[in-house]
From Swiss-Prot:
GO molecular-function terms, A-Z: adenosylmethionine decarboxylase activity
Chain's role: Catalyzes the decarboxylation of S-adenosylmethionine to S-adenosylmethioninamine (dcAdoMet), the propylamine donor required for the synthesis of the polyamines spermine and spermidine from the diamine putrescine.
Cofactor note: Binds 1 pyruvoyl group covalently per subunit.
Sites marked Cleavage (non-hydrolytic): K111, S112
Protein's recorded name: S-adenosylmethionine decarboxylase proenzyme
UniProt PTM comment: Is synthesized initially as an inactive proenzyme. Formation of the active enzyme involves a self-maturation process in which the active site pyruvoyl group is generated from an internal serine residue via an autocatalytic post-translational modification. Two non-identical subunits are generated from the proenzyme in this reaction, and the pyruvate is formed at the N-terminus of the alpha chain, which is derived from the carboxyl end of the proenzyme.
Pyruvic acid (Ser) modification, residue list: S112
Domain of life: Bacteria
Record's subunit section: Heterooctamer of four alpha and four beta chains arranged as a tetramer of alpha/beta heterodimers.
Lyase among keywords: yes
Protein's GO biological process: spermidine biosynthetic process
Coiled coil: none
Family to which the UniProt record says this protein belongs: Belongs to the prokaryotic AdoMetDC family. Type 2 subfamily.
């Protein structure tokens, strides 16, 4: 897309929001309580603040204020207010390509608000536990929150991811013409690294004329030992392993498709 010469500030709002799910099987009530306590501590308010602060660096945001809270019995939330520094538009990369990975983050930039809320969950029957993190990165101006996508998904354990990106409002060029988007985008997937795309089955549902983009991701590889909490698959009977695998896959598909499915 050709560089736009704007009249005044870029008034477009770009919002990236996604849910990240981690699924686990805990055989006993004690194991379920243990998983909830483990995941709640792993993603406490302090750890989430570190992740979001690095996100600010990636998208180019100056932190104005941080509000964080751990909840009882579980869960946490962090909200960061951010602002944008004056930046030379020539230095802003608007091309459609993946953002940095955690180990390659060296950028410094800035913007609007970033927030995350966590929801650990379990049920006394069935042994299934889920952890959900809701994240929203919203910016105003030339910087795209999509640059933080790679980093955030790599930082959180992700069996299932649902992502929404939308551009709202308009900005004017020097001739007074309105522009409702200032960068090219065909798919959110174009902002993901190849190694990430190789790990997931993905589907897009996009409404191009409304500047709304949606991608769903489901982890391809399934290894039962990665889903067990304090129980080894080899300590179970073959029938138990098959039943647990079926229950986990059903849970993951229901979350991925957003509807309950009949038992097979």
């Amino acid at each position: 897309m050709k560089k736009l010469k704007l009249h005044g500030f870029n008034n477009l709002t770009k919002s990236l929001s996604f849910c990240i799910y981690d699924i686990c099987y805990a055989k006993t009530a004690e194991e379920r309580d243990g998983y909830i306590a483990y995941i709640d501590e792993l993603y406490n308010a302090n750890r989430l603040t570190e992740i979001l602060s690095e996100t600010c660096s990636i998208i180019g945001a100056n932190i104005l204020n941080i509000a964080r809270q751990d909840y009882e019995p579980q869960g946490a939330s962090v909200t960061i207010l951010v602002s944008e520094e004056p930046m030379d538009p020539k230095l802003i990369d608007q091309t459609e390509h993946p953002g940095p990975l955690p180990e390659t983050v060296v950028a410094h930039l800035d913007k609007s608000h970033i927030c995350v809320h966590t929801y650990p969950e379990s049920h006394p029957e069935g042994g299934l536990c889920t952890f959900r993190a809701d994240i929203e990165v919203s910016t105003c101006g030339v910087i795209s929150p999509l640059k933080a996508l790679n980093y955030l998904i790599h930082q959180l354990e992700s069996d299932i991811v649902t992502i929404d990106y939308r551009v709202r409002g308009f900005t004017r060029d020097v001739n007074g013409m309105k522009h409702f988007i200032d960068h090219e985008i065909n798919s959110i997937q174009n902002f993901m690294s190849e190694d990430m795309k190789s790990l997931y089955d993905m589907v897009d549902v996009n409404v191009y004329q409304e500047n709304i983009f949606h991608t769903k991701m489901l982890l391809k590889e399934f290894d039962l030992k990665h889903y067990m909490f304090h129980t080894k698959p080899e300590d179970l009977t073959e029938t138990e392993r098959q039943e647990i695998t079926a229950a986990l896959w059903k849970e993951m598909r229901e979350i991925y498709y957003g509807r309950n499915m009949p038992a097979v």
